[in-house]
Amino acid sequence: MTALPTAKLDQLVARHAEIEAALSRGAEGEEYVRLGREFSDLSPVVEQVRALKDAERDLEGANELLAESAADPEMREMAEAEVERLQDRIEALATAVRLALLPKDAMDERGIILEVRAGTGGDEAALFAGDLYRMYTRYAAEKGWSVEILSESEGTMGGYKEIVAALHGRGAYARLKFESGVHRVQRVPATETSGRIHTSAATVAVLPEAEDVDVDINEADLRIDVYRAQGAGGQHVNKTESAVRITHLPTNTVVAVQDERSQHRNKARAMALLRARLLDDERQKKEAGRAAERKGQVGSGDRSERIRTYNFPQGRVTDHRINLTLYKLDEVIAGTALDEIIDPLLTEHQAALLAAAEDA
């Protein structure tokens, strides 16, 4: 493993101290906000660097004690144990510093647009899509995020043919960005009389929420259609033309929202969804051309990739990208154990990024 960039680390520590002094002198307005944000960004890595330097000083002292205790077996044993402990701590802190120095995904702190669509499997696929959507909304509730449904198309027996929702909360994208892909379920459907296990699938897409400045949309490039909202069976459920469909002509991207009775609110939601999709398309194109980033991905990043299987008869969940199996299906589907899959995925992603940085 390559040595840490000590000169850069010293610069970060010095900059952190400089900002702290400026804040204590009473910076105001936008300057205060800017400095406060930079101070918060630097604090984690600076704390790790200081802890690392403290551990290195402690190791020097432990090595000196070890050298002086050659004639005292008991003291030597204690010194050897302390040296080993400090070496392990230094290695862990050095890894933490390297991780803190990795380039951050600018979208990580944002909320998300969550899209869940039933795949192969008919009614059972729609029911499973509903299970996945509820799993994510329960997880969002645990994290203190709010959920706003943008559009939905219910299945004939329940669940969803498609549902799109915004999950508003800091860090939602960082936690859920690796949920994109094909999720497969194996279980006996409620309508199955012979007890046979069926396999169905649903596709999940996680997009970072887009801000106005992220995507430049020319009004002339949009075709906006309004129509009467329809229910699950195709019947009209609204006497006014409140549903909105927006087509971005240059990319032929189409979004439609009909959940609100207000055409104005539906249009605002549709524009938010359109911005997110256009931003995501642009990010996908950029990432496809970056070999180092491809190496740093968990899985292929392709939304047609099968990423996870939920086997109900065995109570098993398997994430195929990292060969992780948990026998906690009920807890995962309830959202309470989803972090036990997400955390290893993030760890694997960080390890891949570190390896790519080492090779660069």
Curated annotation (Swiss-Prot):
Task of the protein: Peptide chain release factor 1 directs the termination of translation in response to the peptide chain termination codons UAG and UAA.
Q: Which GO terms describe its molecular function?
A: translation release factor activity, codon specific
List locations, semicolon-separated.
Cytoplasm
Which organism's genome codes for this protein?
Answer: Xanthobacter autotrophicus (strain ATCC BAA-1158 / Py2)
Name listed for the protein in its UniProt record: Peptide chain release factor 1
Q: Family, per the entry?
A: Belongs to the prokaryotic/mitochondrial release factor family.
A GO CC term attached to the entry: cytoplasm
Q: Which NCBIfam families match?
A: prfA, PRK00591.1
